[in-house]
Amino acid sequence: MRRTVALAGIPNVGKSTVFNALTGSRQHTGNWSGKTVACAEGRLRGGGLTLTDLPGTYSLRAHSEEERAAREFLVSGQACAVVLVADAGCLERSLILALQVLEVQKNAILCLNLMDEAAKKGIEIDVAALERELGIPVIPCAARQGKGLHELEAAIRRSAAGENETHPTAIRYPAMDEDLTEEQRDDIATAAAALRAEEIALTCVRQPECACARDDRADDVILSRRFGVPLMLLLLAGVFYLTLFGANVPSEWLSTHLLALGTPFAGA
């Protein structure tokens, strides 16, 4: 019986790079049965396992054809394990999908890709803490540089053999009214997943102070009750001054110099 491992992730996290690095030239591309969504399959280096590259999707709860195809494949039980590919530089965004996948497939691995790019930005991730929070193995790697791929391949084989002990975290959903529509329920469920993803990211990710943090502090001052009104009045006074008096300076300068330019022609 063919054993299949699925690769899942949001767009632009390097999932295809990971897939190509793990399969090399032993792959082919086709369409999902009854769908126009492209799929790729390949044999893991060393043989014994088939990797299926699922369509990139931000959520399993949305309704695009790609998202339906990914969810149907995971729910069908065709995959004995799932590799969740995440962007180390934007971990929180990747975790929303990862948490949703863990609800339908417990046997999973998180591939923390693009670690090199995260390091350039000064982002540090506590891998051990992330493993504790998610309850699954986490493998840091940089697929484009070939770093961490041997460890990832070994983890995939252990997972496919059922040797990885996993205790996936659960999303805490609020109580929902029976009158809610399916779309409203999906929105609430996605918000709950986003909240859990934020909690995990705050625990495991350390980012350097950046321009956005400085902007937040500036907003706190400008929009505060103590300084906001005086700053607004000062700004309005400046605009009022420029409107009544400030405009005279450039207009007088232009008038003087333009008249001076026209003087030679006036005497001709």
Question: What positions do the PLM features span?
Answer:
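Conserved G1/Walker A P-loop phosphate-binding module
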Residues: 1-63, 76-77
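Conserved C-terminal guanine-recognition region of P-loop GTPase G domains, centered on the G4
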Residues: 42-45, 69-139
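Extended, hydrophilic extramembrane loops/domains of integral membrane proteins
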Residues: 184-206
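Short, membrane-interfacial amphipathic segments enriched in basic
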Residues: 202-216, 258-266
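Membrane-interface helix starts
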Residues: 210, 214, 222-232
